[in-house]
């Protein structure tokens, strides 16, 4: 369990994270995986080479190598390490004490969460876009790591923690600006947390939370919320329609680092199936759509994706000669 301390000192705010020295941030939250299989690498290379309009959908598993935990990974995910569960949308909207607790914890966790950097998997996908291989990238993550890596053909399905909005008037604010307002309102407040959650949340006691002051919207005085989809909320229908159109334009779909347990992402796999698109999945552990995939790889995203050359062509290989034909489930009408 890692410990995180946030306290004011000599006019500055200090954040300190302690973790076991034997575990670097890139491996702390990554579940065990088998060694890379050269044959699987070749199969993924062929899949990518034959793709002309590739759509990629990423989940929390792509960011664990950047030091951000996921929810469901065996032994290392939030659900495996603790009985804590993410905040529910209805609780946040209805309860001022719930918002106070959320923002106090988020305030402590923000310096660490916002400092995370893209790993080789994020950079690889950004490079695929630059070289014209990637038609569109859809991420279920809220960490902004794809944007930091330079991806532009990007939809952040569940929003982004780096933005804050007012629940009354919809005014948007940069999260870093809100951090300064938190500091101004809580000049002598300090806290020590145990454990970090996938969305930058940390774990504080009720006593620590009680004295924390939360700012309101500068424009209308309304309550503030991170611009993300909390559990129990729904994705904006216009955004869903937009992604459905991108899937229908694509000729193949690659899932990276997602178990697809959440319907907001899984629905696009169903659309791809309806379109009879070949589907490949790169994820450590089983997913909800393994039976729909023509290729499944249990490897670290940051180890495998950089090995794929998006410029390589297989003009001598016909789609019907692929070693991993579409599964019968994917061919069903």
Swiss-Prot record:
Induction: Expression is directly activated by ATF4/CREB2. In response to mTORC1 signal, expression is down-regulated due to degradation of ATF4/CREB2. Induced following DNA damage. The expression is strongly inhibited by fasting. Its main location: mitochondrion. PROSITE patterns: SIRTUIN (PS50305). Zn(2+) binds at residues 166, 169, 217, 220. Keywords: DNA damage, Glycosyltransferase, Metal-binding, Mitochondrion, NAD, Nucleotidyltransferase, Transferase, Transit peptide, Tumor suppressor, Zinc. GO terms for biological process: cellular response to hypoxia; DNA damage response; glutamine metabolic process; negative regulation of cardiac muscle cell apoptotic process; negative regulation of fatty acid oxidation; negative regulation of insulin secretion; negative regulation of protein processing involved in protein targeting to mitochondrion; peptidyl-lysine deacetylation. It is found in: Mitochondrion matrix. Residues 34-323 form the Deacetylase sirtuin-type domain. The active site is at residue 158. Interacts with IDE and SLC25A5. Interacts with GLUD1. Interacts with DLAT and PDHX. Interacts with MCCC1 (via the biotin carboxylation domain). Interacts with PCCA and PC. This is NAD-dependent protein lipoamidase sirtuin-4, mitochondrial. It comes from Mus musculus (Mouse). The gene is Sirt4.
